[in-house]
């Protein structure tokens, strides 16, 4: 790595984002969103259905097939009755990123277990988050079909809703439901399969069966991996320099088949979303670890936050193919079909991309680690595309428009 980004000031990645530019709702037809095109320094636009026109026929497009599941919150009434509250969709604010960053108050559409025991009143739970005592309350609002509006409030302005979910939320679906919950398809990608995320990988929300069919007809190969999106994805950067920001750990799974496709399509990987980017780039560093320590344990394969910036010149010279082949060899030795590990990687200016050659992604919040990732990919040219998007009525954040970035 050429540079160490630890002393980058997050204020350098700020831009004005008026509230009216944040998409409050998805479009009725997903693939009719606008598509900003950044190709070799030039910016233009089209509609998302035209995406296949801008990709070479021999590209390998990688999707994150994680499926959003409800965060489960437990409360006990004074009578002792257990109430389970499942967060289904953010309501106020209705953008995932903004909702997770709320302090003191957030509203969600929730499914409620043991509803008959919660006819009225405010649920309360005392808890400790980041070493700080906190009282979380939940108040039931209007009914929407089988779900209810729930207002969450807490009494510590230093704690975000993401912090609460990470400590207080549980992911598994309770067995007593004995059925699929009524999910809002708005929050799932059409190719979602593996349950485990508390938020959707939103870049994938633009894809429809007809866009996927058009990509296949073009000759683009489609492959999948899994990174479960945690609430920590939306953790705001509060330190002046990014050295003071601790990245969240996320769990990843990549099959032997996907690894072999990446090897066969060297230099042609198109990542759908920043979660796919982080997973693919983490694979390189996992491979480098295995080349140096072939008997590394699953825990030792975890990619630490600053690991990419601490490589020796010899380690940094490992080719992407050699790194990927080292993972395949590891799977062979252990008679495994899928790599399961975790990553805490931070991708920021100074990072040298090893595997990803193009990215499909939405427009991200000011002063976010996702914006750092985009800046690193475009070698600092992010302002050009964000200025264009703001000037040409693009919609921002989770429900916003898309972009195809090819440096």
Q: Which residues fall in each region the model found?
A:
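Surface-exposed, charge/polar-rich loops and edge strands
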Residues: 1-407
């Amino acid at each position: 790595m050429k540079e160490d980004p630890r002393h980058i000031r997050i204020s350098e990645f700020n831009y004005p984002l008026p509230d009216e530019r944040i998409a409050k709702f998805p479009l009725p037809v997903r693939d009719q969103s606008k598509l900003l095109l950044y190709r070799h320094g030039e910016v233009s636009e089209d509609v998302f259905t035209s995406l296949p026109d801008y990709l070479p026929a021999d590209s390998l497009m990688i999707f994150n097939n994680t499926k959003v599941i409800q965060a489960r919150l437990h409360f006990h009434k004074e009578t002792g009755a257990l109430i389970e509250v499942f967060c289904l969709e953010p309501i106020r604010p209705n953008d995932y990123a903004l909702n997770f960053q709320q302090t003191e108050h957030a509203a969600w559409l929730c499914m409620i277990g043991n509803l008959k025991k919660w006819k009225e009143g405010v649920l309360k739970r005392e808890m400790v988050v980041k070493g700080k005592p906190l009282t979380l309350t939940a108040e039931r609002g209007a009914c929407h079909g089988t779900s209810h509006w729930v207002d969450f409030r807490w009494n510590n302005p230093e704690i975000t809703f993401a912090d609460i979910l990470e400590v207080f939320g549980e992911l598994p679906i309770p067995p007593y439901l004995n059925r699929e919950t009524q999910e809002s398809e708005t929050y799932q990608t059409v190719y979602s399969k593996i349950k485990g995320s508390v938020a959707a990988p939103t870049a994938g929300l633009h894809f429809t069966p007809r866009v996927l069919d058009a990509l296949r007809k073009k000759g683009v190969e489609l492959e999948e991996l899994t990174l479960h999106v945690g609430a920590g994805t939306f953790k705001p950067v509060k330190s002046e320099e990014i050295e003071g920001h601790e990245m969240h750990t996320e769990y990843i799974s990549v099959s032997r088949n996907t690894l072999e496709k990446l090897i066969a399509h060297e230099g042609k990987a198109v990542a759908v979303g920043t979660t796919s980017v982080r997973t693919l780039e983490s694979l390189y560093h996992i491979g480098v670890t295995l080349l140096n320590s072939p008997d590394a344990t699953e825990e030792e394969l975890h990619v630490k936050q600053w690991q990419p910036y601490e490589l020796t010149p010899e380690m940094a010279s490992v080719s992407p193919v050699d790194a990927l082949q080292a993972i395949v060899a590891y799977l062979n030795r252990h008679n495994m079909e899928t790599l399961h590990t975790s990553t805490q990687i931070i991708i920021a200016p100074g990072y040298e991309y090893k595997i990803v050659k193009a990215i499909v992604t939405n427009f991200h919040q000011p002063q976010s680690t996702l914006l750092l990732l985009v800046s690193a990919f475009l070698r600092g040219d992010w302002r050009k595309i964000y200025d264009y998007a703001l000037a040409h009525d693009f919609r921002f954040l989770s429900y916003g428009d898309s972009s195809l970035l090819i440096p």
